[in-house]
Amino acid sequence: MSNMRGFLVAGVSAFAAVVSVVSAPSAGAETTADRAHSFSETTSVGVHNSYEKATFPYFADALDSGASLLELDLWTNGGGPEWRVSHMNPVASDSNCVGAQDAAGLRSGLRDQGLRGCLADMRAWHEADPEHPPVMIKLELKDGFTAGYGRGPADLDALILGTLGDAVFTPSDLMGESYSTPDAAVAERGWPSVSEMTGKFLFELIPGTIEEGNPLDTEWTDQQYATHLRDLSAAGLVQLGAAFPAVHRVSPGDPRLDRYADPGIRPWFVIFDGDALDYTSGDVDPQWYHDRGYLLVMTDAHKVAPQIDGTHASEAEASERLDRLAGEHASYITADWSRLPNVLSTVVPRR
């Protein structure tokens, strides 16, 4: 694996069965033909809390499952070391990650590793299969960033890019040389083609439940990271940014307008994440996101009426839900369907 981006940090497909793949679009306005084969024109399936041992015994099992989105919950407070991966424990990791050094170690060694170990597993898995379909890694920062302990936005960038290097598809990759923000890039050129995303990880950041409920936290993960990207770009260092901040939760119209007082950070959001039930309630128009090339993550897909089981749905039920929400313009739908590999590996046209 090329690790050029990691060097810079130190210094400062299933869908092919549905549509044929075309060559990379040229610079300039996106054409209808280009868009039909764009990464943003797919709908696929993710697994909630993929790091939990009850969901997958090892994180390698999550990566092997075919799921297009996997979720990690991170804790950063000073009560414990580094970036912990856990659902409820704020001071120690409780995860299925082992910190593998190579593919042979993906299902051996001690689990309960933090983010560093999960990224090592991803690296080992990627090196064993560098042509894997793209995987979105959703990071929920349960209690936000804690920059004073070396757990701020730049520290996260350095850890991700220093481990995975060019296997990460970054905001800079989306922008290329022609566009100043991700929003400008998707508006004019769109996302890369499906084939161009082969072998890539994308990182999505959302604020966590503890952070969102903390009245003393006035700058959540999404705002803080978007500001960080904006500042990196102003300094000519946007290539050091590893992740895409997402607008979390659902509101009508362009949710960035009310959410972010600083208009300078709004164009750094091209991923939106919220409950499927809210996006399909009739109060929000999900086509608005699709028309603009934004990625739309619909969580708790099973709760859309008629509600189905979030963990033990049948393959037919989950497949029907995927098809239905693809028709509601979802890019990803998520639930806890870890035991449905045929569904997890399915990618359908977004419509």
What is the predicted function of each stretch?
Residues 1-29:
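Secretory targeting and sorting signals
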Residues 31-351:
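Catalytic cores of phosphodiester-bond hydrolases, prominently lipid phosphodiesterases
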